[in-house]
Amino acid sequence: ATASEYHYIDYAIHASIFTQQQIDEMNFCKDKGITSFKIYMNLGGEVGHVYMDMPPNSSSLVASKVNVTDELVEQIVKNAAQLGCPVLVHAEDYESCGCGIKKAKEKNQDGLSAWSSSRSPEFEAKAIKTVCKFGRDYDCVIYFVHIGSEQALLQIQEEKKLGTKIFVETCPHYLTLSYEKQNGYLAKVMPPIR
């Protein structure tokens, strides 16, 4: 309400949830006007490094290791459903991604083609299947952000047929770019361009 006096554009803030403590703070967030929560299923294990939690009066982010396990995802979805909030999802299975990246490094593969093959569309579909089951179990709306593959879309269609409440979006780079036609790492994103 206070921000409406100073801004000309409608906006909303969602909270990213990585830890049990943050799950415990979801009610507080909702009370403060945050009405959606985001999870990063691509973060955990060997690929669990993230910058987060900028301390008050600081301009530096804190580096942290997180593990967004299936159990954590289920708790987040359950809490969000009880609060009547959607869950925004970065859908990639972190364990599969970690294995894919390790294999690419062992083979000395590099570049965008290695990045794409190490984070297979199957890993995206696997995460979609996991979170959608929880969405159905707890009657929670699932909002997939930046879907990056046909296989992910096909899995989403299957999950919708099973009754999952789903919204989907993508980004222009998934519609217009391919790793074969890019140089360097300017198009290195997650999920990767195909």
Feature locations, PLM:
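Histidine/acidic residue-rich metal-binding segments in metalloenzymes
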Residues: 21-39, 43-194
